[in-house]
Amino acid sequence: MSLINRKLEHVEICLYEDVQGIVSTLLEDVTLIHQAMPRMNFRDVDTRAEFLGKTLSLPLMVTGMTGGHEELGKVNAVIAEVVEELGLAMGVGSQRVAVERPETAESFKVTRRMAPTAPLVANLGLPQVTRGYGVKQFMDAIQMIEANAIAVHLNPAQELFQPEGEPEYPLSALEALRDISKELNVPVIVKESGTGMSMETAKLLADHGFKILDVSGQGGTSWIAVEMVRNRRKGNWKYESSQLFSGWGIPTAASIVETRYSVPDSYIIASGGIRNGLDVAKSISLGANIAGMANPVLHHAVRGKEQLKKFFEEVAFQLRAAMFLTGSRDVKTLRHAPLVISGKLKDWLESRGLTLSVYESIRKGA
């Protein structure tokens, strides 16, 4: 299957097949403490956040998922237009197809035309570095959308179970990426792809100079499950194995804590199963700087601009409600808001040797 057709199939599967992770985000184990006297009016809540030198109206970005085909360009155009109007940030899907097939670049370029002032994030995969991508290919992707940053995605699990996968992740690839990053004119964001980020990985990335991290944890779209569907359709021998591993990964809530704990000065994007404004609030209170959404945005975007705007407006209200009811006047205050960690998340963190009292001071200092 061509890379272009694979992109279309991925989106079709995300829209019409059940590929949500069988493991939760564990955000349900985070309880924000209600304050019966918020000490402010609801209209006083300030949801603005800083990202890539720009101010967002909400601590929220659309993380990369689509591009590489004319039909996907239409979806990107809708998302970009709404992002521009509402003051959000946006990442595009992997641009490998456009770097190698420039005739497909329009499906990505449309984002900058529709969002002239929004922070836009380009996207390439680390396996491409292993296969020879260098500064030129990275600059091609950045210039394609006049990006404010470029995300480099880590997806070893997806690559492993993909029929055409390239599970090539030697340490030399990260070292090469570090060298490439020094020649770029925008920051590099390193992101996972739905299976989460451990404290070991976060520390390794930070040691190589990467401190803007998208944890993309388990609990949202499972890209192993996406490849499981593709394996089933093709009768591929990897089907049963991909089914077995469809719940593999680190839940989003645990990924946030592990990353903040191991790299206290990192800038964390919390994505993976973020579905509403309360999820955004919990993610930030746990230690993230902003949150990211992909799958729910895709589902609303294919139904049109107004449907997507309505969705984001509802998310904004839910976030503001959580901030008001915790007495959090702004996003920084929300990061200091009292919370209770219980259940499986507490068990996870304790078994990983994370002292909650120590983490409490780390998250408040972020």
UniProtKB/Swiss-Prot annotation:
SMART domains hit by this protein: IMPDH (SM01240)
Annotated positions binding substrate: R6, K7, S94, Q95, R96, Q158
Compartments, record wording: Cytoplasm
Binding residues for FMN: T63, G64, M65, T66, S94, N123, K191, S216, T221, G273, I274, R275, A294, N295
Gene Ontology CC entries for this record: cytoplasm
Quaternary structure, from the entry: Homooctamer. Dimer of tetramers.
Record's protein name: Isopentenyl-diphosphate delta-isomerase
Organism: Metallosphaera sedula (strain ATCC 51363 / DSM 5348 / JCM 9185 / NBRC 15509 / TH2)
